[in-house]
Amino acid sequence: MENSLFKKSEKKVRRALRVRKVLRGSSLKPRLSVVKTNKHIYVQLIDDSIGKTLASVSTIAKSSKAAGLVKKNQGVAKALGVQIAEIGKSLQVDRVVFDRGPFKYHGIIAMVADGAREGGLQF
């Protein structure tokens, strides 16, 4: 008999795979991956053709801590979206594929997307 925590994590992995089997990032249009945990938010630009992370920002990065972006809330999520958009522009990236992972497009995930759009990324 399996326990409920194992089933919950198994369902989370399945949801993420269901989303990611359709999405593929390239060097011209990388994948914008958003992960949230109980304490932090992580945002990455990933080139799946070479399997490399092009840029990343999070609430645990030194630059975010210096800017006061340490709590996990919607305002911080929007600021992280703007930051990743600025980094993407410096890498000549203007179009991305949004990867929400196993999370609903709601709340913090939606605010990261809105911040990235405000920063100039298109998806």
Curated annotation (Swiss-Prot):
Xref: Pfam families:
Ribosomal_L18p (PF00861)
Q: Which UniProt keywords apply?
A: Ribonucleoprotein, Ribosomal protein, RNA-binding, rRNA-binding
Q: Which GO terms describe its biological process?
A: translation
What the entry lists under InterPro entries is as follows:
Ribosomal_uL18_bac-type, Ribosomal_uL18_bac/euk
Would the keyword Transmembrane helix turn up in this protein's UniProt record?
Answer: no
Gene Ontology CC entries for this record: cytosolic large ribosomal subunit
- Nucleotidyltransferase is among the record's keywords: no
What are the recorded GO MF terms, alphabetically? Answer: 5S rRNA binding; structural constituent of ribosome
Record note on quaternary structure = Part of the 50S ribosomal subunit; part of the 5S rRNA/L5/L18/L25 subcomplex. Contacts the 5S and 23S rRNAs.
What family does the entry list? Belongs to the universal ribosomal protein uL18 family.
- Which purpose does this protein serve, as stated in its record? This is one of the proteins that bind and probably mediate the attachment of the 5S RNA into the large ribosomal subunit, where it forms part of the central protuberance.
Q: Which NCBIfam families match?
A: L18_bact
The protein's name:
Large ribosomal subunit protein uL18
